[in-house]
Amino acid sequence: MNETVANNKETRGFQSEVKQLLHLMIHSLYSNKEIFLRELISNASDAADKLRFQALSNPALYENDAELGVKLSFNEEHNTLTISDNGIGMSREEVISHLGTIAKSGTAEFFSKLSQEQSKDSQLIGQFGVGFYSAFIVADAVTVRTRAAGLNADQAVLWHSAGEGEYTVEDITKESRGTDIILHMREDGKEFLNEWRLRDVIGKYSDHIGIPVSIQTRVRDEEGKETEEVKWEQINKAQALWTRNKSDISDEEYQEFYKHVSHDFADPLLWSHNRVEGKNDYTSLLYIPSKAPWDMMNRDHKSGLKLYVQRVFIMDDAEQFMPSYLRFVRGLIDSNDLPLNVSREILQDNKVTQSLRGACTKRVLTMLERLAKNDTEKYQTFWKEFGLVMKEGPAEDYANREKVAALLRFASTEVDSAEQTVSLESYVERMKEGQDKIYYLTADSYAAAKNSPHLEQFKAKGLEVILMFDRIDEWLMNYLTEFDGKQFQSITKAGLDLSQFEDEQEKEKQKETEQEFQSVVERTKSYLGDRVKEVRTTFKLANTPAVVVTDDFEMGTQMAKLLAAAGQAVPEVKYIFEINPNHTLVKQMADEADEEAFGRWVEVLLGQAMLAERGSMEDPSQFLTAINSLLTKG
């Protein structure tokens, strides 16, 4: 390999997260240890992609060696397996940065999710992306020799570690550009010091890699016996998978390519591969993962597609081709219309980009529509993983609001379960005659929603109510105002009107009761003063004495909680206090002549209503004093 040791050797400690990852990986991924080869070959392929990209503006980086590839060789006598590439290579600073630290945000959050349960942890670690560190699954020591393209031969670097607490790094001379990774195999890793085992793994994981992957093999004589002469034999097809005809690609190949582009260990849920010719010429290969990325809700989560231009790799995580609510989509887009020197800044305001973004978005939504229609169970698997981010869609993607809304799922009073299985389409199909609104309720939890006093009249009248209890739901409903021509109506708002479901006799009786009860309403308002916006009677309740509601255009309880949790200033919510004149406790309050005792009744009923609505009250002691006083009197 033409390397000679130079100088400037130093010993450095691993970042603490690296130590933790190495330990967990060796134990959690042991049963699937062959993935180390997929990871290392994938990294080598990425290094070739990066060299191609940089060489577009600086062809001298090829150093008269533009035939890029990956080569594997092994030495049974020395127990070593070597993976070599002639890609971009690394400088000393890059070696320390890439091989000594984990340059990811949210690393601590990732480790906190680990359960010490092997199957779950291996899945999480796979999502995190182990890359280079997977070498330690089969090796008790790893040596890296690398030189960055464009640097002098004497600016190469040697990195070595036994995968424990530290590593060494030193300057060497290396004539060839690129990286050699030498694995000093463990006893239980020696199965990979075998040509046929390596062929099997490469065929399984790396057929789709766009550069040749070759293995060193002995030349056989005329009788078929091995000689001392060796040659390099290409093992993979070395054709970019997305450039092949769909009919020639097996499901297994699509699945392995997904693992290559996503560094996920699990198979994808579904995918879509399309070649489009016309106004824009491009190929897209889009995958829906089966599991949500562990850091999907992290603001710094990197998302986006791999971008190729005319089959030349340009960048990872090109987020411009997918809206934020579809940030879980993995895959690539290969455009013939973008310039090869395209940058993230150019992509931002590019008409081609906007056109491709619209097309890719519609492609993903169509995939999900078909899944929801044809495989309800599989769609529920998707919803459990990605439902929360899909609820960001109506606010972000006005053009596709109706499409996204049709994909949303909720709990409802129709289904006695916290599972979010009800579509808006199915709700509309079940609407009663005369019903022109979609009724919904937001709450802190399913239990709070299911047992809300606001539901009583809806249950009595057989009206279905959508139950929302995700933190994002109240925010969502600011943007999702109608579906299929039907307006949404919160059942906790003052403007709720169910009169179309009541007969004339019932309406007349309510009017009489309201007039009879007017003096009680005025006494209550006089006692409470400006603590509430208004006091009035309600006939929407059956078993509950009182509730609080907000005006149609005033901030609701759940939105106030959402803003407070985000650390934002929240204006005071002024509630309307509604009392049920048919309830025994309200009648007792109405019959109370003593104003002090009447006030205690008001405190108890308002306290109950606030507790049911908000889950808390501003002055619990006042509430308890009123209860104790009434109980003592009783």
UniProtKB/Swiss-Prot annotation:
GO terms for cellular component: cytoplasm. One of its GO terms (molecular function) is ATP binding. It comes from the Bacteria. SMART domains: HATPase_c (SM00387). Residues 1-344 are annotated as: A. The keyword Transferase does not apply. Keywords: ATP-binding, Chaperone, Cytoplasm, Nucleotide-binding, Stress response. Residues 562-634 are annotated as: C. Pfam families: HATPase_c_3, HSP90. Its main location: cytoplasm. InterPro entries: HATPase_C_sf, Heat_shock_protein_90_CS, HSP90_C, Hsp90_fam, Hsp90_N, Ribosomal_Su5_D2-typ_SF. Belongs to the heat shock protein 90 family. Homodimer. Molecular chaperone. Has ATPase activity. This is Chaperone protein HtpG. The lineage of its organism: Bacteria, Pseudomonadati, Pseudomonadota, Gammaproteobacteria, Vibrionales. The gene is htpG.
